Amino acid sequence: GTRKTGILLLFLVAATTSFKLPKNESPVLISDDDRIIGGTQAYPNAYPFMVRLTTIWQNGWGGSCGRSLIXSQWVLTAAHCVYNLEKSMYWERVIVYLGDHYSQVTDAHEQVKEAADVIVHENYISSGSNDVALIKLKTPANINSYVKPGCLNSKSNDFIGQDATAAGWGLTSTIGNTISNVLMEATLPIVAPKNCPIINPPTMICTGFKREVGQDTVFKGDSGGPLFLSKNGFTILGVASFVTLDNSYPQKVTSAVFTKVSAHLSWIQENTKATDLWCAKNNHHS
């Protein structure tokens, strides 16, 4: 991977720039301050691997993204959350909130950590593909029932036809700036790649919607957050990357795309060298 310690060059170029879009659809990165649309409020601490991140940029602007704790000292997120070559913006500080539910207050079981290192996938830097990154915490998390790593999916199964969950803090509508200060969740069906106009099936997962009206999906601020299954523990399938919007109805999200975890396991292992990854012995999904 490409590693920068201390100051990291940040990059917000869409992972979709090399694809040709249908005329009626446009890609939108689920970037800083982009959130769950619709959905329901999650039960407090229901997802102990969920991480909220705040970045403080060189110009004083702050951003927010979702992340997943995958080992006691490692967090998984989207590359576009932490790397912006186009704007030549640097983060001065990254703050990671573990065991968080209410973003506006300090929760009883919340742990606050700072980033010691960030690793961005080298293909993202060169071509905008492989929208995935790792953050190493300065000190390991205190693992308990409120803060616990999720398992990384190691199965080749694409889970098409199954329902998965996405979670994040934020925008509850494509209209205006109504932001939720609590963790929200949405159920998203995993659909065949042909349903996503911009997708590289070996490295991406396509999701659709459970209902036609008031569609639940991910949007701005949910970037980097997980797509996961909750049976027999939590298995992380993907990392929120981008959505496509209908050009005729700009408030309508047509699909949401996640970076596929199983396609990046060797990269994650190589760069973290963590011994407590994957939960392979406890991964019951097939």
From Swiss-Prot:
GO terms for cellular component: extracellular space. The active site is at residues 80, 131, 223. Residues 36-273 form the Peptidase S1 domain. One of its GO terms (molecular function) is serine-type endopeptidase activity. Keywords: Disulfide bond, Hydrolase, Protease, Secreted, Serine protease, Signal. It is found in: Secreted. GO terms for biological process: proteolysis. Residues 19-35 form a propeptide. Residues 1-18 form the signal peptide. It comes from the Eukaryota. Its main location: secreted. Its EC number is 3.4.21.-. InterPro entries: Peptidase_S1_PA, Peptidase_S1_PA_chymotrypsin, Peptidase_S1A, Serine_Proteases_S1, Trypsin_dom, TRYPSIN_HIS, TRYPSIN_SER. Disulfide bonds join 65-81, 196-206. Belongs to the peptidase S1 family. This is Serine protease SSP1. It comes from Scolopendra subspinipes.
